[in-house]
């Protein structure tokens, strides 16, 4: 049984089950939650923020090369290697092969170019600070310029040939230019060789270059479709620029909302041809006749409007004339209506009282009738009881007399 001192405390729900609520986790989950919270708030854990969009853009249209890969556990003399990747993959299909001097030179140029770009970005974003650093962006830019000058001054292009001067930003264009230059050189060599007369067959020149051209029709179709889409886009922009919006107030712009540029040009040409001198005279004559009709319609409309206005004014005047005698008696009529209103209210109250009195009178009459009926019954009962009592007394007297004898 509960303690009686807690019986009348406020806020206690009666005739309801007891509910114990808490915001804490169960005991089994509290230790795990504390460990996760400590790991999230600890300064020893490095939290890396990953941008999904940047990661997608970086690895978009990239494929993993599986040539020469072996993940098996077979025993052999050669080492089984899986995927190999580095910061700079400029060897193409020759991953795992030692770099040639040309490839190393291209990689160094690429690294210097990337470092220069990053330093320029740092110089644009980082503000000058009072604290001294070991390598400030300005000093680093100077060192990069000196390194690039030293790399260019090594004259590796002369040693490695024109292949080392490939433009890394546009390798396909650079290869095409190199192909054209070597073809021109081959033509010049053939022209010089045909000018001299030789009696014996000369062996084939080993300096000639043989090229293999591989056609890619899918890429050609894709590039052609891209060019067509670009052309359609430019035509759409041109049509949107030339086309004007439909203006209901301007008759000259009616019908210029064509489906394409050719329809708009045809409509404009038809409108311009309508401005011929011979056509303008006919248009002017028709406009003069139309203007005369418009003036007549305006005059007729003005006369009709004047007649309508006069009729309305006459009706209003007659109404005012009829209202004048009524307006003089209106205050007395209002006063009388107010008085009659009070009288009507008193009469209504008197009628309600009469109705209540009549109802009360009927109730009293009914009560009197009931009381009279009850009185008659009581009198009858009293007579019967009185006669019975008298008979009983007579019997008692007779018995008393008999007992006295």
From Swiss-Prot:
One GO cellular component assignment for this chain's record is: membrane
Keyword RNA-binding among record annotations:
no
**Residue positions where Phosphotyrosine is found in the record:** 6, 88
Localization in the cell = Cytoplasm, Cytoskeleton; Cytoplasm, Cytoskeleton, Microtubule organizing center, Centrosome; Membrane
Q: How does it sit in the membrane?
A: Peripheral membrane protein
- Please indicate which superkingdom the organism of origin belongs to: Eukaryota
**In-chain residues carrying the UniProt-annotated modification Phosphothreonine:** 136
Q: Which GO terms describe its biological process?
A: mitotic spindle organization
Per UniProt, the keywords (alphabetical) are:
Acetylation, Coiled coil, Cytoplasm, Cytoskeleton, Dynein, Membrane, Microtubule, Phosphoprotein
| Residues recorded with modification Phosphoserine | 85, 324
Residue spans making up a coiled coil are 105-132
- N-acetylalanine occurs at 2
Tell me the segments the record calls region Disordered: 1-25, 187-207
Family per record: Belongs to the dynactin subunit 2 family.
Q: Its function?
A: Part of the dynactin complex that activates the molecular motor dynein for ultra-processive transport along microtubules. In the dynactin soulder domain, binds the ACTR1A filament and acts as a molecular ruler to determine the length. Modulates cytoplasmic dynein binding to an organelle, and plays a role in prometaphase chromosome alignment and spindle organization during mitosis. Involved in anchoring microtubules to centrosomes. May play a role in synapse formation during brain development.
Q: How does it assemble?
A: Subunit of dynactin, a multiprotein complex part of a tripartite complex with dynein and a adapter, such as BICDL1, BICD2 or HOOK3. The dynactin complex is built around ACTR1A/ACTB filament and consists of an actin-related filament composed of a shoulder domain, a pointed end and a barbed end. Its length is defined by its flexible shoulder domain. The soulder is composed of 2 DCTN1 subunits, 4 DCTN2 and 2 DCTN3. The 4 DCNT2 (via N-terminus) bind the ACTR1A filament and act as molecular rulers to determine the length.
Q: What is this protein called?
A: Dynactin subunit 2
- State the species of origin: Sus scrofa (Pig)
Name the encoding gene, please. Answer: DCTN2
């Amino acid at each position: 049984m509960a303690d009686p001192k807690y019986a009348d405390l406020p806020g206690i729900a009666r005739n309801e089950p007891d509910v114990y609520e808490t915001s804490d986790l169960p005991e089994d989950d509290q230790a795990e939650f504390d460990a996760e919270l400590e790991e999230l708030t600890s300064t020893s854990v490095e939290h890396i923020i990953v941008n999904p969009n940047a990661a997608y853009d970086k690895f978009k249209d990239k494929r993993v090369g599986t040539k020469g890969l072996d993940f098996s556990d077979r025993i052999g003399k050669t080492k089984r290697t899986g995927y190999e990747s580095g910061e700079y993959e400029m060897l193409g299909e020759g991953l795992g092969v030692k770099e040639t001097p040309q490839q190393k030179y291209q990689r160094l140029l690429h690294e210097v170019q990337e470092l220069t770009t990053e330093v320029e970005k740092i110089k644009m974003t980082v503000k000058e600070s009072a604290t001294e650093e070991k390598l400030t962006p300005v000093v680093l830019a100077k060192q990069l310029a000196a390194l690039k000058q030293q790399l260019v001054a090594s004259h590796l292009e002369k040693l490695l040939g024109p292949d080392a001067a490939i433009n890394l930003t546009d390798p396909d264009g650079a290869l095409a230019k190199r192909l054209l230059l070597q073809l021109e050189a081959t033509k010049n060599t053939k022209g010089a060789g045909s000018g001299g007369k030789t009696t014996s067959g000369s062996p084939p020149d080993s300096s000639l270059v043989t090229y293999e051209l591989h056609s890619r029709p899918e890429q050609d179709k894709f590039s052609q479709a891209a060019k067509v889409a670009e052309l359609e886009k430019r035509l759409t922009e041109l049509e949107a620029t030339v086309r004007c919006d439909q203006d209901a107030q301007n008759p000259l712009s009616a019908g210029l909302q064509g489906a394409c540029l050719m329809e708009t040009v045809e409509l404009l040409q038809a409108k311009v041809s309508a401005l011929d001198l011979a056509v303008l005279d006919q248009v002017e004559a028709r406009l003069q006749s139309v203007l005369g009709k418009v003036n007549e319609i305006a005059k007729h409309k003005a006369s009709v409007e004047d007649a309508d206005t006069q009729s309305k004014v006459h009706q209003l005047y007659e109404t005012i004339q009829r209202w004048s005698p009524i307006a003089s008696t209106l205050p007395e009529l209002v006063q009388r209506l107010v008085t009659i209103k009070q009288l009507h209210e008193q009469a209504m109250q008197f009628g309600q009282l009469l109705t209540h009195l009549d109802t009360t009178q009927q109730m009293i009459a009914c009560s009197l009738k009931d009381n009279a009926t009850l009185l008659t019954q009581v009198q009858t009962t009293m007579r019967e009881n009185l006669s019975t009592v008298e008979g009983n007394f007579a019997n008692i007297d007779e018995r008393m007399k008999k007992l006295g004898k």
